[in-house]
A protein has these predicted regions:
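Domain-level signature for soluble enzymes in the chorismate/prephenate branch of the shikimate pathway
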Residues: 1-208
Length: 208
């Protein structure tokens, strides 16, 4: 037989506040793209659950839009990576003066888990880094770094011959960053003969 729980006034007040908030949000309606509303809500829930640090102007704007205003700016990539030791997320500009993304090759415990904006028609301006690995969603793009000095067009053609659709994203300090269509893992056999003495996948992100 089920027993009636004892009254908890504080919990009842919280439940009532939650119901009111849900009702008000539903009454406010949805935007032109319901998936956009879902993405924004997901970002705010993630921000409530974990610390978000940012480095760079574009990263600050995009992170605030995705995760809300509870983001904290840090001085450099070192500080951003250090903050990840206690969990959370780091959002950094792709077009930074130094190729911080290349350092992820030596930090396999960290990886790209999202890219902003994440619209498939837009070029990523900031990458979201986490100590947690991302998994395939069915609609992803991966990020690959190389020190190959070849022209971008030759690198793209070589990867295409191996079955990978690549696009150049950034180049700094002798390193180049490319996006690869789909979810590509670090040990993908198609990358065995990839251009460059130093190269590798540094993570993947869903696209919408």
């Amino acid at each position: 037989m089920l027993e009636e729980a004892q009254a908890d006034e504080r919990r009842a007040a919280l439940d009532l506040a939650l119901l009111r908030a849900i009702r008000e949000r539903l009454e406010a309606g949805f935007g032109e793209r319901p998936d956009g509303d879902a993405i924004a809500l997901r970002g705010r829930l993630e921000a409530e659950a974990a610390q978000v640090v940012v480095r760079g102007a574009a990263a600050a704007i995009l992170a605030a839009d995705r995760y809300g205003l509870k983001v904290r700016a840090v001085e450099d990539a070192d500080a951003a990576f250090a903050a990840l030791a206690s969990g959370g997320l780091a959002v950094l500009d792709v077009a930074a003066a130094r190729p911080w993304w290349g350092r992820l090759l030596a930090r396999p415990e960290l990886s790209v888990v999202a890219a902003l904006p994440d619209d498939r028609r837009a070029q990523p301006q900031a990458l979201v880094i986490s100590a947690r690995k991302s998994g395939p969603t069915g609609e992803d793009r991966s990020f690959w770094v190389t020190d190959a000095a070849w022209p971008d067009s030759r690198i793209v053609e070589t990867l295409s011959q191996a079955g990978l659709a690549a696009e150049p994203l950034a180049a700094r300090g002798g390193l180049k960053l490319f996006t690869l269509a789909g979810y590509v893992q670090a040990d993908d056999g198609r990358l065995i003969d990839a251009p460059g003495a130093l190269s590798g996948v540094i993570g993947a992100a869903p696209v919408f």
